[in-house]
UniProtKB/Swiss-Prot annotation:
The chain crosses the membrane at residues 1255-1275. This is Probable serine/threonine-protein kinase DDB_G0282895. It is a single-pass membrane protein. It catalyses: L-seryl-[protein] + ATP = O-phospho-L-seryl-[protein] + ADP + H(+); L-threonyl-[protein] + ATP = O-phospho-L-threonyl-[protein] + ADP + H(+). It comes from the Eukaryota. The active site is at 1500 (proton acceptor). MORN repeats lie at residues 40-63, 169-191. GO terms for molecular function: ATP binding; protein kinase activity; protein serine kinase activity; protein serine/threonine kinase activity.
Amino acid sequence: MNNQFEVFRPNSYTYDVLAKQYTETIASSGHMVLSHHGFYKGNLNENKLKNGKGTFLFPNSIYSGQWNSDKKEGDGTLIILKPQKIQKKSSQSKSQQQPPSQTKKSSSPINLSPRLQGQNPTITTNGSNNNNKVNIESLINKLNDKFNQCEELINQTSQEEFLKQQDYYNGKWINGKANGIGCFHFSKDDSMHYDFWRYGVVIRYANQQNILKPLYDDSVPAGLLNSREILKDMMEDWKSVVVGDDDFPCTRPYLTTPTASISLNRENINIYSNNNSNGTTSPTSPSILSPTQVPLSPPKVNTAPSTLISEDDNNFTSGSGFCSPSSSLSIKMSSPISSGLQHSKTQPNVSQSQNQQIQQQQQQQQQQPSLLVNSTIVQTNTNNNKFNDLLINQRNQQKILKKQLLKSNQQKQSFGIITSNYLKSRLENEEKFFMTLILFISKWEIPFKSFNIPNNPSIHASFLIFVPDTDNCTFISLSNLIMQSNVLERLIFKLLIDPMSKVLNSTALNTLTESQTLGNLSTYNNNNNNTINNTISIGQSKSANSSPNKISPSVSLVGVSSLTTLPSSTPEERELHKLLPICLDLDETPHIEKECIASILNIFKLFPTIEDYQPPQFIPDTICKFISCFKKTRALENYLLQKQFQMSKDYFFKPTATTATPNNNNNSSGNSKLTTTTHLTNNTTTTTIVSGSKTLKRTKVTPPSQSSSSSSPSSDQTNLPSIAISSSNGISYKSPPVTSPPPTKPTFSVSLTTSNKIDISASNPNGNGMKLYGSNATTTAASSILNNNNNNNNNNNNNNNNNNNNNNNNNNNCGQRRQTVESIFPTFKQQSNTDLLTSLMQSTSISLSNKYSSSTTTISTVDQTPPELTLQSLNILLSQFKQSYLFPDSITLSFNYLTKQKENIEQMEKIIQSKIQLIQETKPKQQQLQQQQQKNLLNYSSSFNEYLTNHDNLIDSILIGLKNDLSQLQKSFEICLTLYKEMITQQIQLVLKRLKSAHSFINQLIGLPQSRVSKLPKDFIVRFIKHTHRIIYQLYNSANNTFIKLDNEIKIDIDEFIVQSNDLFSKLPNGAITTNGTTMNSIPSPVSPIGSPPLPSISASVYEYFLGKKSSSSLTLNVSQQQQSSNSLDRSSVQFEPSDITPGPFSFISPLDKIIEEIMSGHYQLILPVASSGDDLLVSVVSLGLIDLRSYLSSNNRLKEISKSSLIQLFNILLHSTVICHNINSYLPEVFKTLILLLPFYPKKDELFIKYKEIFIGFMELCVIDELCGFSFIYLEFLGLLVKPKKKGLRKELKKEFVELFPIQLFIDIMEKPIVDATNKNAEKTRAQAAQILINLSISSIECLLEVKSKNALGPILDICKFGQAFAHTQIEESELQILQFLGEGALAEVHKGIWKGKEVAVKIFNEGSFSFRLEDFLKEVAILGLISHPNLLKLKGACIAPRSHKSTFMIVTELMHKGTLLEVINKNKPLSLEDIIKYALSVAQGLAYLHSVDFIHRDIKAANILVDKNNNAKVGDFGLSRVIDNNFNMTAVAGTPKWESPECLMGEAYTSASDVYSYGMMLFELATGDEPFLEIQSIVELARSVCDKKLKPKISSSVPNFISSLIKDCLHNSPKKRPTMNQIIQKLCNHKC
């Protein structure tokens, strides 16, 4: 082991570090470093920062994995240590083995400057002073001992048994936090849970869109269209919530000066070193540094170091072994908020009192002028005593600070993984953190009305944060975590025992205790003659010196609207007034809620406070624990379920709501004026009856049959003012305008209007305003854009730094591409609820307006008949209904708690009474004292009396305390009893209101027409009634409990509701329910209520009908815990009524690591919220998942099996996601690759183009601008499929519109754009795809082909085809062909008859073994056959191009010409009739005329290359020698058969269309005579001499008709210019034919 230690300082650090190099397993970059923050073993980079693989021991955790510049980056594991389970074998140091004489401290200083000068300081055993050598060795032994202990612990962490006992995370890390897919291990149940992590927390997606819609509607869910960058914004807010949560809270403070501990010995002072400007270290003069001076800690941070070599070596790893100063850091943040629960930036810190103590001690140290002693003082004998005193003083101060730091180290850090324990610790230790977290939850999870920060109602898709709960081995949401915190209980505790936290008039209390009992507090409040705006709180009265107590607004939060609260303005009451509606399930009608809270708080204030008496903590704790029984345990689940149920009701029933303005005017006449108000709230719809000036707390419940609306559970829309809230922690809140619930399935008639068609000029740096697309587009415009784009790219590259050229290019390009996407779709970005894409994505008909204006998109809705109820939808509604209307568990819990409390109090009373009796008996009586005085013979009576009196007083104080304890104990039970009556009364009233809403919904079901419920069982309504029947039965039992009697009014309300609901209950199998005022003897005992699931659970058991299998588990809404196996999707399900439910996977709250599996299972709507999340990491995960989706769809012919409706929905969703997602690098290419796979099976391509052409324009602009990103060639391939010829693409009219939007010249410019960077493979692919689009357009339209020809683009297209980069044919697999009999052969190929797709075809198989075969010729012939299309040209069916091997084949598949070649027809039917001659000649002439019109020259026209079908139609074939006429150069004469070639071709001159006319004349000679021309000539030399020099012509028989003979002579004219054109030949043949 290397014993040499070095002290160095990285450039970014403000202090030195102590390190030790090791070489056993790692190269020279391996170091071990010890610090106050922990111990590191691993690699360091050239800047001495952690880089590469390494392990760091934090105070309470261990990270092992990849590092990047001091940040956890890459793959790694964080172990959350359990200190009590860490077994560490401490090795015996060498200093302990040495004799005391050798370890004795020397009194003379050590001079280490020779080893420190000019290099990093080191500590070795090679000292020059023998007297100090032993001391240095002892120091090094101590350091080695520490390093060995840490290494031992690191080795222990790699053991499987050790890991099994720890909670740990294993996965991806970015910037020191868990980011990406990772798994978390719970040690208690040894389970692994895979999730998607972001910034140290788990992110899951809550599908709040109506799940019934996918059953009926294949279009894109409209509610998801407006969601953009939700996750990105949420995580930015989350970073503000947990601000300051770093691994090393200071500026790079992962190590501090190691000499802080060494300086305790005067002999070791010279180890200090200073930081030079260049980042190196140099030795300093001997000095003593205070704990607050540099380099011990960075400036402006209050901290104090713990020693590396602690005086108590045994405490090194005992929870605070590393003594991290981070826990004591506290950067003060100023805040204008004075309340105890205020919103502010918070970070982990110690309590304020601890900070103040540390600051005071530091100030005292700084005020000591002699604390910093220079070297001259140290070396002066006269100052030795003073130096020693200061040294001792410093040691004592360090001990004090160390103890404080050890205490502050209990404040936990997350170290990249935020757990529930971490958040709870911050909630308990930071007063402001609770408000910060509440505001975050109110914005992103549950809109808390008391804080007036609801989340955006237009966001139907939201992401939720979950954190691991190591105590319960599950994941818990933030809203449920808040309910588990003790903030509410702490405030109640303070309100109970602190007399300054409550204002209670003693006169009112006396009056109350004399005239009212604790059991009639609610009656006392209801009998007040004041209105709600002038209510006197319970326990208070008007005094002569005070104004009437009114419910006044409290002190507002920053930007939050005022809230009415109690007459008192104490902070505790104001905060409880805000927290009680959050934590308790209260009636959310505003004035009823205020009254309920006022009653609760005033009951708390009845707890007496006795002067000079502090009650035992357990006494007020009983009240706090009792209130905890009423806290919400499933806040998030209930909110999401109620929201989902409301959406389901709106989907099946037209939303109706009765609203009225509350009557705020007092009725002085006393006449009862009734005003009914319906309030839509988060939990329920509450109806309040206001009678004159008196507000009744109890509401008479009207019969369900008389109700006209169903509005419970409530929607999340609340009539709150729209305000902007800016908090000090950086989270911005703005309450959006209230929107109505989504209507029932509408029919849209859309008129689209935009300001302008998106044109390329928006991104043109020259700003010339030229449009790229449209009928007015010009070639110059497209060319200039491409040139400008090249210039921009070059300029950007030239402006980058040389050192970081590649990185800067990538970053700049990414930023520019993102800005480009946002600029391309400005219309889509600006619109919200009336989004253009909302209309584009509808499945109904859409009319596009040709006139564009600046107005927004208008959507007119037409009512449509609601969907029919099926068995599946009924079961979903039933499950939602049961989960939305539940019997409160708090009633049972509170009752059980109260009964146990009564038993405990009775026992305590007996014990206290017995103690009081015993103590009273021990007190001496007065008679005994007098007798003792008489017997006292000495004069000690006064002393004796004083002694006895003091003891008597002590006994009296004990008696008073016990009596007070007994009184407080009794009072606490009375308060709990009163609270029980108050809370149960409120709960029963709230449940009755919700049951009224439930029965209204049931009546709606009963009133449905038979046509909508024809598929349902006759008794389907009974299932709903059974559930409400069970709840009312339980309410009845609770109200009639003999142990605690409630008010008779509550019982009357329940009886009245039963009577009013008798019609519904009569439908139950047991018949009608009867009641005799207060009895319900005829009600059968229902099944016990459904138990509540564990607190942190949230899974999708509401919708288990989608899941793959069935079970008999209870209908509870469990939050989805990940399956331990990461390879399979959670298929747990619930048995519904009935059980015949179509299986299929679905999760209400989806773990994002399973998002691809759910998408592959058919839930394509989940793509949109992920794509629009704005989180690049999550989008990249889905991008990789799309690869698996394509593989899944491609295998086993799944694309052919998928339904058309599902395919349309998937296609539309993917296409829409490309607009709302701006991730060009990974997402857009993968999406369009998937669209390319789906497009051939898309049944409505014409409608697709009409809907999305505006989007296609935008992406075409992006394609032109952003070629280097790898998106251009993919998008061009997509467009190429869209314009495929015939029925595979758009119809002919839409292709014309396509060409108007995307001019031909645009694709020609892309195809001919020079490739500057040879390494850019995408550029070549882009050229090929542009050529492919031109090919498809040319095949589909002769006009496009002529335009391509006129722009001289056919040659480049064929060149691309020649190399197999583009194809003008259908690609046929060899396995698809069935080769039959042989038909013939030529020089390069043989022809067979074949079968393809059940039809007869001709298969031309090229002979690869032939020396003359060239693949280029084969591909060229295929391309020519594919490009041209004419009735008199051989029709190409496709081609088979197999990989070149010894078994490979290259085949062309054409239509089968049954009669063979024209030569064979001539030979069989010689001589031909004039009619046949004219027919064949005219057919060939028409085919050649078409070829010449598109600048093709056949170059081998003869009877052997003309084919005849069964209808005697002649068609030109064998295009192997065809060439494209290029005006820029002459074609060579190396062409077809010499005897048929023109004289100029034989002479080597240019080959033109006139050459084909000459060959056509020779073919006409064959038709007329039946003979081959120039039979007498046998050599090419003789042929050339005869034809070129002698002007020899073939001899025409006299039997040939004159006009045929004349036509032959004209075609064989020696001068090409005097030969007729093919069109002239056609005219002559047609004239003679007529």
